[in-house]
Amino acid sequence: MCDSSQSTADVLIIGGGPAGSNAAWELGQAHHRVILFNASIDRLRDPDVNTASTRPALDLLLHSRRKTPDVFRPFRQEIGKESSEVSVHNQRITQVQRLPNGFFQAEDDVGHVWTAKVLVLADGAEEILPDIDGYDTCWEQQRILTHPAEDEPRSLISSCLAVLAVGDLAELTMALHTVWQARQFAASVRVYTHGDEDLARALETRISPDARIAIQTTPIQSLQPGSDSPSQVVVHLADGSSIVESHVYHRPASQLQGPFARQLNLELTESGAIRISARVPYMTSLDGVYAGGDCASLGQRTLFKALAMGQGLAAAVAARLERGNWGNAVEEQD
């Protein structure tokens, strides 16, 4: 364990998910002193959910945007055992700042302080769930697909896929793309516009009459987990009727999970992700601060991409540190 009051590391990494953990491992292998902070909790609140059976490995790797079990806990434990250069802390970092000497300081929720030459943000993102009663329960029970291919292979070929055209998916272009994609996977599609009559009319004029795509305009009163299958959802409508759906698709918007971009006054993209440089890989708008994983890619969140970004982060940070150690220092900025 590093002495938080005296020892200055090469890199502080906030976030122990795929991007942060992979970056920590790669940097440790390159003999850079790394402190990895992870404060994730078990993201599935329902203890009865059998995550091993409900989330296939390929689903987690290729499509998952939802909060998932902490599958990287064993990896972080192994990093701490196998790499003498990496220390893993489960403290929750609450404050970061750049010091006058150009180093970075992080403080946890009990007042411990760490410093390093470089700061890496890989603290992830969180979903903004729509304000529909019961949605959060169905989401946590993983009954809402975030990609049509998430479910068992070929399970939608003879089924109806319900699409919730709410939130970001209530925008016409996004709604159309989503509905057409859903129809590619399912025998039929039912679109819930949640009372948005204008969206319903716009969709009707752009969807083929024989496409087997129905539009339901009645506002949704609540969602309820069904009892016949792990994916079933009962949609209760404001007119008192209910529709049992075997599969429901929706992709909620995402936002940054931590306060660090705001504390460091980092530039953000239009989607709200941390903007990273096109010239200096993974560098943010503040020299010495790098970002990767979901916090730098809100729109495309998969484990494969996060792992790749973690490796890229490590390469970029290592190059900076090694140039500082053995070459002429050149400030990296756009």
Swiss-Prot record:
Q: What is its EC number?
A: 1.8.1.-
**A GO BP annotation:** cellular response to toxic substance
Record-linked InterPro entries: FAD/NAD-bd_sf (IPR036188), FAD/NAD-binding_dom (IPR023753), Ferredoxin-NADP_redctase_2 (IPR050097)
Q: What is the main EC category here?
A: oxidoreductase
- Its pathway? Mycotoxin biosynthesis
Keyword annotations for this protein?
FAD, Flavoprotein, Oxidoreductase
Q: Can you quote the record's cofactor note?
A: Binds 1 FAD per subunit.
Q: Which SUPFAM superfamilies match?
A: FAD/NAD(P)-binding domain
Q: Which Gene3D superfamilies match?
A: FAD/NAD(P)-binding domain
Q: Is Transmembrane among this UniProt entry's keywords?
A: no
Q: Where does FAD bind?
A: 16-19, 38-43, 93, 122, 294, 302-303
Q: Which cofactor does it need?
A: FAD
Any single GO molecular-function term of the entry would be: oxidoreductase activity
The role this protein plays is: Thioredoxin reductase; part of the gene cluster that mediates the biosynthesis of aspirochlorine (or antibiotic A30641), an unusual halogenated spiro compound with distinctive antifungal properties due to selective inhibition of protein biosynthesis, and which is also active against bacteria, viruses, and murine tumor cells. The non-ribosomal peptide synthetase (NRPS) aclP is responsible the formation of the diketopiperazine (DKP) core from the condensation of 2 phenylalanine residues.
Q: Which family does it belong to?
A: Belongs to the class-II pyridine nucleotide-disulfide oxidoreductase family.
Record note on quaternary structure = Homodimer.
**What is the protein's name according to its record?**
Thioredoxin reductase aclT
Specify the species.
Aspergillus oryzae (strain ATCC 42149 / RIB 40)
